């Protein structure tokens, strides 16, 4: 039953969908094919077809008929046979076939005898015609006759008849003898008809007469193609729009020959670059061929103040030109300028070269012009001139007699010593016929852009949509307005047609003719101001204002579109370019405390130009609407001004208020309406032409910094910004203050207009203007209306709850009200409509308020539904995320998988652009991208801060096709946005460095995932590991010497000096961050990790509350107390680095926690010298540790003192200390990752020094030397066998607590206050948990990530310190902290161990939460248990900022595993839930998990799962989370 019901609903839905689709299709078809209400209206193409008759189809021409049979017959050559073949055509004219039809005149004899001698053909009515309208027809009349053929034009609304002359245009040469007759009609603005008449009064006079192909050509306005007139040859002349022809040689010769100027318009803009150049828009590609040439682009206005000119013509020359000043006293004897590469010419008949040359003075030399063809051995000389000329321009025209194949023009001037002359070059043109023969086709492409003020159709209510005219700057910018050619190109294919003024105050002003009398809404947009060199966050916006004006047909509106003020950057020369890049601060340094200029000036932005719309009355301009321009920004942003500070825009509407220009100071004020200013840097008023001001003289003379104001009165800039143009110009600061912006101009609305939109500063670029036919909605109730697209009528708009009445004016509330309105206006004899009842919607107040039960039911159902959906969504998200992470961990766990996973992908990157290095902005485009195909990964080196680090090869980096060994840092594909930003920032930082003691960034590969950073391969590893590995020991001598240690210190000092000189603060100079090129004696130490610098520069502040790690033991007091980081911070860190080097890799401040180090350093304490440290070296350390940063030496001084040490025999001959601690294998073992992990959970080993601990939970060892901290593991099931590893070695004696004095009297190191290394009695179990950590380290290029988990929390610490004793048999307390302390992780055990001060050193008690008792397998002198230990596994996550947990793959095992069978005894305590790891006697198997220990910290912001409780003490790792310190953001 349900199935049948569903089928029914489906069929019903399909039926409804089909009906709706059919209805929509009918509506769309009706919309696409509208019904024309006037059948007489047709398109121009249809009119052209109607006026053409070839008699192959029905013809619209009317034929005379004086008899019932008719006088004209349509026939063909096959149908009409004659006895004489030469008296009839063998084919028609239109088709050229014998089957084609033509019109034959064959009057009857009775008609001729009646005296009717006239026969005619009349065209259909033509509404109007263009200037090239003409009649064309074909006639066949083989024998001369007395009959006469004529044509005339008759206007339909009058009796006037205008005869037109028929002339023979062409005649077929074959026997068909068809003649083509043509008569010019011309432009007619009234409807007319054309009549062709033949007069003959006898059959003999008629003879055989046939017509074909009657056509009115080019008579319909708007034809895309216009045939040439009869007096123009298509391929040898150009037809002007208004009639007449000019020769092709005169096209594009800088002389306007056509009345409308089309011969110098769009055609010339299509010519190749450099072939038509007046130098008004730039050099057009004409450049000096050598850098020593003196040719330069100038204008006549720029030469007015030049007193060294020899003549006056150049000063009076308008526009720009190339200028060469010849002065024979110098070494220069020639100058050369050449054009850009030009294409091949296609004709040599009408091709000619024309240019204007000026040469005046005592010139002992020659000026020559040559053509250099591509591939030619020598240039072809086409013109040469020497001698003396007058002080005037000479126009030179040269014919190009040969077809050139790819060439350029070259103008050379040679002179001898003693010459003194001025030479100028202007208006260079190769005629358009050189490159294109179809000039008329090029011209007709621009016909929609007629330059005359041809009236547009008057807007009416029947138009489909309001007409809009949009005016722009025509692509021009700067202080001068556009040209006619620019506006013609910009308004192409639009309805805008303007004439641009060329001279005087109207230069650059666009003139537009109002097409119809109506009310227009005019909107004006002022231009924005320019940006300052270092004040480019936000520009001053131009003002938008709109008003309505009544305009009459034929009115001329003058529109000046404002140009944006020029930005100060990029600079015009290398010095200003450096200032823009932030590499130079000469302007800030050259200003007084009050902000006034001392020497340097420039760098401000120019003022924006205003947009003026006005018209002429009695020869004087009358402003209608003025949108003010924005002021220019100063060189620097005012720190006291708010970024969001805004001012209320104002406007003036009183014409009696004078439109003065803004006040000018060091920068130029904005131009007003009718003011006059003599300052060149002030913006000109509109009556002066509205040109933008130039830069202040100081900026031009010192820095050559030219920053102009925009066209429209924008003021020129200095260090302060220029004022904006307007009705009243914006003021500029009186003093050249580097942070004083120019003010905006004042807008204006004429009282005759009505404000439509209040002014608003919103324009961010050049100005604009919009003119729209305004819809008058005053008759509507809501004062708002629109134009209906179907009826073309204006319809009033009603509110959402109202309906428009049939009168299209009134709004009725409901259908009931509408019905009442209709009945009210019905006639008396009409029956009223039955109105529907007034329906009140449910739930309204008519039904009363809803009940409380209903409200509660709705609320409860909503809440329940929301909770259910929320829970379901969260559950789904949780399981999906869990499964996804599990899959990702499995896939990305192996480094070999990443080796094979190279997949193409597009990089999407974002970074903070506000921070740069070495004064330069950081950009990803500066990184050297290496194609992925050139990179080969060889093997994995380790895991770094982001991902795996590989050794690889890259091709093509050294200029040869040889492979370069590199280290490759990778960023996993699946990572957070912060990791990606950190990765890119580290690449940007390292790419900026170029020094022999800083690891070099070879390149990057960011376009394909995973992303790579290619670094210099450092095979020697990090310095800390190298020093620890090469310590001299009792049975092992070291190859290191004191001189080699000094060389390593010198190498790092060289790198630090490079960073210091470039004002770069490293923030973490330490041995762990220094790498060695090789382990041999030729090693070079380099700085290789910029983790902290990356974190600082990646964000705009130092995150105090984040999880960033701070190297406390390497930081000076002002850094961790006040958050101040300077170059002196690195000096302090370098002192600690020296201590590390000469202690051979020990942790600074031994046995001190971070908090103790803070108190120790701030209290004035400093570390003692390492053992065997030479005195001069220790003095360098203490000088680096001066409390006052100013007293610390810079790295140049440090380098000098290190060099002195290298030359001191007492220093370099000092022997290195011999260590009697553990063998080297315990410090540098490799990590062995077993295949299986088991299911063990690591637990904390709670150790107590108390002798009165519970004997059931303790095991006493009789051999204190063998006591080791062990890892207690909890197993959910009993295991019978385990794989264990052991290494019987002695712990170092320097990390153990000593209960009695004198036990730890280090012979070469005295710790301040003689504090033992034991934990205080206040240390809690949670603190011990925090002190146990896991170190993850990339041996060569990685960063450190330290993390441990315990009871839902993690901690970051380190376990390295200095040895306190050299006695290998010293008693070791298991609760002590050594340099090789085993990691211990607490999972769910509650441990509370507080050893008393009197704990015996010879006995250790391990107290777990619960542990079953075990018997020693040996049962000998002590308890020796085979511990149950499994290897922890290191979880590898796909991102750099990850948490690392312990599992079976994180410990180092012995090469020979020992399988020990264990039997687990049941626990006698109900609380015993975990197994115990015991300690063994000497000779028994001792399982000691070994972990690589190196001092570092995690550069990434390591996130812990939960927030741990605040510990009382920290491990002596040297690092602390930033949230534990009071760090001021920097």
UniProtKB/Swiss-Prot annotation:
Glycan-bearing residues: 148, 364, 495, 653, 776, 808
Gene3D superfamilies: 2.60.120.200, Low-density Lipoprotein Receptor (4.10.400.10), Phosphorylase Kinase, domain 1 (3.30.200.20), Transferase(Phosphotransferase) domain 1 (1.10.510.10)
Domain MAM: 51-221, 275-436
Signal peptide: 1-25
Residue ranges, compositional bias (Low complexity): 1400-1413
GO biological process: cell surface receptor protein tyrosine kinase signaling pathway; developmental pigmentation; iridophore differentiation; maintenance of cell number; melanocyte differentiation; melanocyte migration; pigment cell development; pigmentation
Membrane-side (Cytoplasmic) residue stretches: 873-1530
Reaction(s) this enzyme catalyzes, per UniProt: L-tyrosyl-[protein] + ATP = O-phospho-L-tyrosyl-[protein] + ADP + H(+)
Membrane topology note: Single-pass type I membrane protein
InterPro entries named in the record: ALK/LTK-like_GRD, ConA-like_dom_sf, Kinase-like_dom_sf, LDL_receptor-like_sf, LDLR_class-A_CS, LDrepeatLR_classA_rpt, MAM_dom, Prot_kinase_dom
Main location: membrane
Tissue spec: Mainly expressed in neural crest cells (NCCs) and iridophores. In adults, expressed in the head and iridophores of the trunk and eyes, as well as in the swim bladder.
Alphabetical list of Pfam families matching this protein: ALK_LTK_GRD, MAM, PK_Tyr_Ser-Thr
Biased composition (Basic and acidic residues): 1497-1517
Cellular localisation: Cell membrane
Means of activity regulation: Inhibited by ALK inhibitor TAE684.
Record: active site: 1068 (proton acceptor)
Role description: Receptor tyrosine kinase required for the establishment and proliferation of iridophores and their progenitors from multipotent neural crest cells. Iridophores are the blue-tinted cells that reflect light to give fish their metallic shine and which, together with yellow xanthophore and black melanophores, generate the zebrafish's stripes. Following activation by alkal ligands (alkal1, alkal2a or alkal2b) at the cell surface, transduces an extracellular signal into an intracellular response.
Stated name of the protein: Tyrosine-protein kinase receptor
Originating species: Danio rerio
Lineage of the species this protein comes from: Eukaryota, Metazoa, Chordata, Craniata, Vertebrata
Gene encoding the protein: ltk
């Amino acid at each position: 039953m349900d199935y049948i019901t569903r089928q029914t609903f489906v069929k019903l839905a399909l039926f409804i969908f089909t009906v709706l689709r059919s209805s929509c299709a009918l509506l769309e078809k009706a919309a696409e094919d509208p019904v024309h209400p006037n059948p007489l209206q047709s398109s121009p193409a249809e009119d052209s077809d109607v006026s053409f008759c070839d008699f192959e189809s029905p013809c619209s021409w009317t034929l005379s008929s004086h008899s019932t049979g008719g006088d004209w017959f349509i026939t063909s050559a096959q149908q009409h046979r004659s006895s004489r073949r030469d008296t009839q055509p063998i084919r028609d004219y239109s088709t050229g076939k014998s089957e084609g039809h033509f019109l034959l005149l064959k009057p009857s004899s009775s008609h001729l005898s009646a005296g009717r001698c006239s026969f005619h053909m009349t065209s259909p009515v033509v509404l109007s015609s263009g200037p090239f309208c003409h009649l064309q027809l074909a006639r066949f009349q083989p024998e001369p006759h007395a009959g006469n053929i004529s044509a005339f034009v008759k206007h339909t609304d009058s009796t006037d008849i205008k005869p037109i002359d028929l002339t023979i245009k062409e005649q077929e040469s074959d026997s068909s003898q068809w003649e083509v007759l043509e008569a010019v009609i011309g432009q007619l603005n009234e409807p007319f008809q054309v009549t062709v008449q033949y007069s003959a009064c006898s059959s003999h006079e008629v003879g055989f007469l046939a017509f074909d192909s009657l056509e009115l050509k080019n008579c319909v306005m708007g034809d895309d193609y216009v045939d040439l007139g009869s007096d123009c040859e298509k391929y040898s002349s150009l037809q002007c729009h208004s009639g007449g022809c000019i020769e092709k040689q005169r096209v594009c010769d800088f002389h306007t020959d056509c009345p409308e100027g089309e011969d110098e318009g769009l055609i010339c803009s299509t010519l190749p670059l450099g072939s038509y150049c007046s130098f008004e828009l730039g050099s057009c590609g004409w450049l000096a061929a050598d850098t020593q040439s003196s040719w330069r682009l100038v204008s006549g206005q720029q030469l007015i103040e030049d007193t060294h000119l020899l003549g006056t013509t150049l000063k009076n020359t308008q526009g720009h030109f190339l200028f060469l000043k010849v002065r024979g006293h110098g070494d220069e004897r020639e100058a050369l300028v050449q054009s850009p590469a030009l294409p091949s010419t296609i004709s040599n008949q009408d091709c000619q070269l024309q240019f204007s040359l000026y040469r005046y003075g005592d010139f002992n030399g020659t000026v020559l012009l040559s053509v250099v063809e591509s591939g030619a051995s020598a240039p072809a000389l086409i013109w040469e001139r020497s001698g003396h000329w007058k002080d005037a321009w000479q126009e030179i025209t040269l014919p190009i007699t040969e077809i050139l194949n790819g060439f350029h023009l070259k103008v050379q001037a040679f002179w001898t010593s003693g010459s003194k002359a001025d030479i100028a070059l202007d208006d260079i043109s190769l005629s358009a016929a050189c490159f294109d023969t179809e000039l008329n086709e090029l011209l007709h492409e621009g016909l929609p852009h007629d330059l005359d003020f041809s009236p547009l159709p008057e807007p009416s209510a029947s138009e489909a949509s309001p007409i809009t005219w949009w005016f722009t700057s025509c692509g021009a910018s700067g202080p001068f307005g556009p040209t006619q050619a620019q506006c013609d190109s910009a308004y192409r294919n639009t309805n805008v047609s303007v004439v641009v003024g060329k001279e005087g105050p109207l230069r650059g002003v666009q003139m537009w003719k109002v097409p119809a009398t109506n009310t227009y809404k005019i909107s004006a947009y002022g231009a924005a101001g320019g940006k300052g060199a270092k004040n480019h966050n936000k520009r001053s916006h131009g003002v938008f204002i709109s008003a309505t004006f009544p305009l009459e047909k034929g009115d001329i509106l003058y529109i000046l579109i404002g140009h944006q003020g020029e930005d100060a950057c990029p600079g015009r020369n290398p010095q200003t370019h450096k200032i823009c890049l932030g590499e130079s601060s000469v302007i800030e340094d050259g200003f007084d405390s009050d902000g006034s200029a001392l020497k340097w000036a420039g760098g401000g932005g120019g003022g924006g130009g205003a947009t003026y719309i006005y018209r002429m009355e009695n020869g004087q301009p009358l402003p209608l609407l003025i949108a003010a321009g924005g002021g220019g920004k100063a060189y620097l942003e005012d720190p006291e001004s708010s970024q969001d500070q805004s001012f209320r825009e104002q406007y003036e509407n009183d014409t009696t208020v004078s439109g003065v220009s803004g006040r000018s100071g060091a920068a130029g004020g904005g131009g007003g309406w009718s003011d006059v200013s003599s300052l060149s840097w002030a913006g000109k008023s509109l009556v002066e032409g509205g040109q933008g001001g130039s830069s202040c003289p100081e900026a031009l003379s010192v820095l050559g910094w030219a920053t102009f104001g925009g066209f429209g009165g924008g003021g020129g800039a200095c260090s302060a910004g220029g004022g904006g143009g307007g009705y009243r110009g914006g003021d500029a600061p009186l003093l050249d203050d580097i942070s004083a912006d120019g003010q905006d101009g004042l807008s204006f609305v004429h009282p005759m207009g009505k404000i439509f939109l209040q002014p608003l500063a919103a324009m961010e670029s050049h100005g604009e203007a919009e003119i729209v036919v305004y819809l008058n909605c005053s008759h509507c109730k809501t004062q708002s209306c629109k134009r209906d697209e179907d009826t073309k009528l204006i319809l009033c708009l009603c509110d959402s709850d109202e309906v428009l009445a049939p009168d299209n004016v009134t709004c009725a509330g409901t259908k009931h009200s509408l019905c009442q309105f209709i009945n009210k206006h019905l006639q008396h004899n009409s029956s009223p409509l039955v109105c529907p009842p007034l329906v009140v919607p449910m739930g309204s107040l008519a039904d009363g308020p809803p009940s409380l039960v209903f409200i509660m039911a709705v609320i409860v159902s909503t809440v329940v539904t929301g909770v259910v959906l929320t829970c379901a969504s969260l559950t789904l998200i949780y399981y999906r995320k869990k499964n996804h992470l599990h899959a990702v961990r499995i896939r990305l766990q192996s480094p070999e998988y990443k080796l094979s996973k190279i997949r193409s992908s597009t990089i999407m990157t974002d970074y903070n652009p506000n921070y740069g290095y070495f004064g330069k902005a950081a950009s990803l485009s500066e990184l050297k991208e290496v194609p992925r195909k050139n990179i080969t990964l060889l093997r994995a080196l380790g895991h770094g801060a982001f991902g795996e680090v590989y050794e690889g090869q890259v091709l093509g980096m050294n200029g040869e096709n040889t492979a370069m060994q590199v280290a490759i840092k990778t960023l996993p594909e699946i990572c957070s946005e912060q990791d990606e930003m950190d990765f890119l920032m580290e690449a940007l930082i390292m790419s900026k460095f170029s020094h022999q003691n800083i690891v070099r960034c070879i390149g990057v590969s960011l376009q394909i995932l995973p992303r790579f950073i290619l670094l210099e391969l450092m095979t020697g590893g990090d310095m800390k590991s190298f020093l620890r590995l090469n310590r001299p020991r009792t049975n092992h001598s070291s190859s290191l010497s004191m001189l080699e240690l000094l060389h390593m210190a010198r190498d790092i000092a060289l790198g630090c000096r490079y960073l210091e000189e470039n004002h770069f603060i490293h923030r973490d100079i330490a041995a762990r961050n220094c790498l060695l090129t090789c382990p041999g004696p030729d090693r070079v130490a380099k700085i290789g990790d910029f983790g902290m610098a990356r974190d600082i520069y990646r964000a705009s502040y130092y995150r105090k509350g984040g999880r960033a790690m701070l190297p406390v033991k390497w930081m000076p007091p002002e850094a961790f107390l006040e958050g101040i980081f300077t170059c002196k911070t690195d000096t302090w860190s370098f002192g600690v680095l020296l201590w590390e080097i000469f202690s051979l890799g020990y942790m600074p401040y031994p046995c001190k926690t971070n908090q103790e180090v803070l108190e120790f350093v701030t209290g004035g304490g400093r570390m003692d010298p390492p053992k065997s440290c030479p005195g001069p070296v220790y003095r360098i350390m203490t000088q680096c540790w001066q409390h006052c940063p100013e007293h610390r030496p810079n790295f140049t001084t440090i380098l000098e003192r290190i060099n002195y040490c290298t030359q001191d025999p007492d220093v370099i001959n000092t022997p290195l200390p011999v260590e009697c601690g553990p063998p080297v294998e315990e410090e540098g073992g490799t990590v062995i990752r077993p295949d299986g992990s088991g299911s063990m959970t690591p637990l904390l080993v709670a150790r107590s020094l108390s002798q009165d601990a519970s004997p059931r939970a303790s095991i006493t060892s009789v051999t204190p030397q063998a006591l080791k901290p062990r890892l207690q593991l909890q197993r959910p099931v009993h295991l019978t066998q385990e794989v264990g590893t052991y290494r019987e070695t002695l712990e170092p004696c320097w990390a153990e607590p000593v209960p009695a004095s004198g036990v730890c009297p280090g012979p070469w190191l005295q710790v301040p206050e003689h504090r033992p290394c034991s934990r205080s009695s206040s240390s809690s179990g949670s603190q011990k948990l925090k002190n146990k950590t896991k170190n993850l380290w990339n041996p060569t290029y990685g960063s450190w990530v330290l993390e441990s988990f315990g009871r839902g929390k993690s901690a970051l610490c380190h376990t390295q310190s200095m040895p306190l004793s050299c006695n290998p048999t010293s008693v070791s307390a298991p609760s002590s902290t050594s340099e090789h302390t085993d990691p211990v992780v607490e999972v769910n055990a509650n441990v509370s161990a507080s050893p008393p001060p009197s704990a015996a050193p010879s006995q250790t008690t391990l107290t777990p939460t619960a542990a079953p008792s075990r018997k020693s397998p040996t049962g000998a002198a002590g308890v020796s248990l085979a511990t149950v230990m499994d290897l922890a596994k290191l979880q590898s996550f796909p991102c750099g900022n990850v948490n690392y947990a312990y599992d079976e793959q994180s410990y180092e095992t012995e090469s020979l595993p020992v399988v020990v069978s264990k039997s687990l005894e049941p626990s006698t305590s109900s609380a015993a839930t975990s197994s115990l790891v015991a300690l063994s006697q000497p000779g028994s198997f001792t399982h000691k998990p070994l972990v690589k220990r190196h001092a570092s910290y995690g550069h990434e912001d390591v996130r812990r799962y939960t927030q741990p409780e605040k510990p009382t003490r920290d491990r002596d790792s040297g690092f602390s989370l930033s949230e534990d310190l009071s760090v001021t953001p920097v």
